[in-house]
From Swiss-Prot:
The gene is hisA. Belongs to the HisA/HisF family. This is 1-(5-phosphoribosyl)-5-[(5-phosphoribosylamino)methylideneamino] imidazole-4-carboxamide isomerase. It is an enzyme of class 5 (isomerase). Pathway: Amino-acid biosynthesis; L-histidine biosynthesis; L-histidine from 5-phospho-alpha-D-ribose 1-diphosphate: step 4/9. Coiled coil: none annotated.
């Protein structure tokens, strides 16, 4: 099981939001590149980057910061936020990003997602961001009438092989992941599931390993010091052999 540190970027700075609320934002660093270097130095094998401005506007905004990260670290970077057009996805991959996360487009443009999966294969991750079990879009500002489990089924039918599941009410709240929802999504021989939102301590990591998720994205707990990355990595490796 892989531990993936998160770097959320707004206006070029590394920040964290509480439950996706832009009005409840904490700035942790002015230089996201320095943060990426720190996580790499502490043993990260992958970094999860979110362009928050892009998520809200629908087009990538922090391109320079993303490029600087991919050019600086020697580990893979996955990127989400505002990637709702084929040309933007292609451009992100051209920046050196290994995988991109498609969220809003999975709801509103199924044909686009089908094309992206056909063109880029496993470099496409479907982001399922849920509020009370229903998928949220547009930087989490709109809650749809589509259940997270239904979207997962639809995307798997199109060929998606990897999902990131985020429970919005837990994101940035350090209240624990939604173990029940994650357990519903993890299936033998099914798409890989990466857990995100609410991870606050090492016991959460042990429980996620038991559920069988492929990876765990950790944000706020790393920035507050609640979790020390090398410890989290060691526990993930021990728990999953």
């Amino acid at each position: 099981m892989e531990i993936i540190p998160a770097i959320d970027i707004k206006d070029g700075r590394c920040v964290r939001l509480y439950q996706g609320d832009f009005a409840q934002m904490t700035v942790y660093a002015d230089d996201p590149v320095a943060v990426a270097r720190r996580w790499q130095a502490q043993g990260a094998t992958r970094i999860h980057v979110v362009d928050l401005d892009g998520a809200r506007t629908g087009r990538p905004q922090n391109v320079d910061a993303v490029l600087a990260i991919t050019q600086t670290v020697q580990i893979p970077v996955q990127l989400g936020g505002g990637l709702r057009r084929e040309e933007d996805v292609a451009a992100a991959l051209a920046l050196g990003v290994e995988r991109v996360i498609i969220g809003t487009a999975a709801i509103v443009e199924t044909e686009l997602v089908a094309r992206l999966l056909e063109r880029f294969g496993e470099r496409i991750i479907i982001g399922i961001d849920a509020r009370n079990g229903m998928v949220a879009t547009d930087g989490w500002t709109v809650t749809s009438t589509i259940a997270a489990t239904d979207l997962a089924g639809q995307m798997a039918a199109l060929g998606a092989r990897r999902f990131i599941y985020t429970d919005i009410s837990r994101d940035g709240a350090l209240s624990g992941p939604n173990f029940t929802a994650l357990a519903e999504l993890v299936k033998p021989d099914g798409p890989a599931i990466i857990a995100s939102g609410g991870i606050a301590n090492l016991d959460h990591i042990r429980q996620l390993a038991q559920i069988g998720v492929e990876g765990v994205i950790i944000g706020k707990a790393l920035y507050t010091g609640a979790i020390y990355l090398p410890e989290a990595i060691a526990i993930a490796q021990t728990a999953t052999g």
